[in-house]
Amino acid sequence: MPLITLPDGNTIEFPNKVTGLEVAEKISKSLSKQATIISVNEELKDLSFVLDKDCSVKIFTSKDKEGLETIRHDTAHITAMAVQELFPGTQVTIGPIIENGFYYDFSRKEPFTEDDLNKIENKMKEIVDRDVPTTREVWKRDKAISHFKDKGEIYKAEIIESIPQGEDVSIYFHGDWHDLCRGPHLSSTGKIGKYFKLTKVSGAYWRGDSNNEMLQRIYGTSWASQKDLDEYLKRIEEAEKRDHRKLGKEMDLFHFREESPGSVFWHEKGWKLFQKLVAYMRARQEKAGYKEVNTPEILDRSLWEKSGHWEKYGEHMYTSQTPDEKIFAIKPMNCPGHVQVFNQGLKSYRDLPLRISEFGKVHRYEPSGALHGLLRVRAFTQDDAHIFCTEDQITSECLIVTNLILDIYKDLGFEDVILKYSDRPDLRVGDDNVWDKAEKALLDAVKASKLQYTINKGEGAFYGPKIEFVLRDAIGRDWQCGTLQVDLNLPGRLDASFVDKDGTKKIPVMLHRALFGSLERFIGILIENYAGKFPFWIAPLQVVVIPISEEFDSYAKEVNEKINNAGISSEVDLKNHNLNYKIREHSLSKIPLLLICGKKEVDSNSVTIRRLDTNKQENMELNLFLETFSALNKASSN
């Protein structure tokens, strides 16, 4: 007689064992129709799972994250099922869910075409119409290996061979078609619905190793309703228009070359944008009491071994051996260098907190397939800072840092921020009393922000808890940018110490802090958030002065000079093109203001302003223009 406890605390007792679906039916008929999966004592299961003991049960529908993810998982399965029905001989590999969708990797000699994707989609809808029942079987490991080898599915067999001896595996059947899978899954293919779309095909190495075969990865998205699917596809269309790689080319900001993958070639305008952000951050940090330093980009292997990075991060580091057989590594992060700066000279408790910042160039190896414009690079600049403080100062410093980060995001147009707080993992270093202080300090800072936050239990680093700052952009996408991390490990490993009030030497606590994270990545996010139409003070080129004919070139040059002298970035366009051509050209480059100069403007010592994305024009006296827009140009004053 299992006693089922529901999330609201109510209980239902059954005379005999029951399935998850029967529990849903007992609650309500409508719930049983909407149910996708259940959790039993917080473990996700199919609706067909048999409950024969007392347990806690939660029922999920497509409105829940877990329910929607199950729909996407099932859609990945019927993608593979459709492919093998249409293209016999194609081998399946893996098909996980990802954010907003799924993918499935296939081994096939012929490339999938756009026409193939349409055929696969139609076959998937046919499979949904068949409403094929889904069943689960548990097989012995060796049986599963033999079965998939006999079918010619060498990739599935290889996956199962990596499972420990003696461990059983679960196989899900959709009719006769079946796949190795942990589940859970919907009860039939008809439950998936037809609210899916295959979006693209790309290459992917088996197991992410470039030494292995190149597979074909089909991406797709799946939703609970047509409305949700349409809205998502609209967001994707808008995201493509905002793609920073496309806009970066149109706006003449940067480019990449195969000769230096993952490294940015900044053009003049792009570099101006980069420098503006650095100048803005530098000014904000100086006001907040940070001391800016610069540390070497290449450091001896011995320091990386002592810091622990060589063991934990070595595969991502670029190394070089010198003629005297010493091994050096290009830094993938700035923290060991900052500890070396702290260690110069005896430090007292009176010197703390000590806030050290750097715009440090770092290099991290990323597989070529993972590189993505400015958003995923191998060489980038961190707006890194490390705060050395006492245990008693952790709380106040965390509050100060959090407020600074949120204030800067607000200046840059990001007011919708979500915080993710991660506390101690099972495997960790440091005293539990210090962990208590560190966790309370970060959680207090999170709560004081009055922003939405999530708690990720046990997901902190082994050396300390952390906060991640997630920005939501203009089209609803989330970007993880800033971090605040308490470090109870590195200062001790690298012999950092200070003399406390009682004259004893103590190890300082170190706070890792980044606001942008990577400047390159943040610029990519800025471009996409604003679709290249930056706020006036951020824009790399703020004004273009356009004389309507050669007769007014002299006045246009004079205006341009005065604008630049006022601290506003301006150019004058004297090219031999007509006015409409120039307006189109500079509008494509997303210049915020175009100033038209003709006889009327010369006679009245004024300019006619044409703002981006409008046909309206406004005449303004030149001195008033300089006064008005100099005030907006706050990058160097904040």
Swiss-Prot record:
Binds 1 zinc ion per subunit. It catalyses: tRNA(Thr) + L-threonine + ATP = L-threonyl-tRNA(Thr) + AMP + diphosphate + H(+). The lineage of its organism: Bacteria, Pseudomonadati, Pseudomonadota, Alphaproteobacteria, Candidatus Pelagibacterales. This is Threonine--tRNA ligase. Zn(2+) binds at residues 335, 386, 512. GO terms for molecular function: ATP binding; metal ion binding; threonine-tRNA ligase activity; tRNA binding. Homodimer. Its EC number is 6.1.1.3. HAMAP family: Thr_tRNA_synth (MF_00184). Pfam families: HGTP_anticodon, TGS, tRNA-synt_2b, tRNA_SAD. Belongs to the class-II aminoacyl-tRNA synthetase family. It comes from the Bacteria. Residues 1-61 form the TGS domain. It is found in: Cytoplasm. Catalyzes the attachment of threonine to tRNA(Thr) in a two-step reaction: L-threonine is first activated by ATP to form Thr-AMP and then transferred to the acceptor end of tRNA(Thr). Also edits incorrectly charged L-seryl-tRNA(Thr). GO terms for biological process: threonyl-tRNA aminoacylation. GO terms for cellular component: cytoplasm. Its cofactor is Zn(2+). Keywords: Aminoacyl-tRNA synthetase, ATP-binding, Cytoplasm, Ligase, Metal-binding, Nucleotide-binding, Protein biosynthesis, RNA-binding, tRNA-binding, Zinc. Residues 243-535 are annotated as: Catalytic.
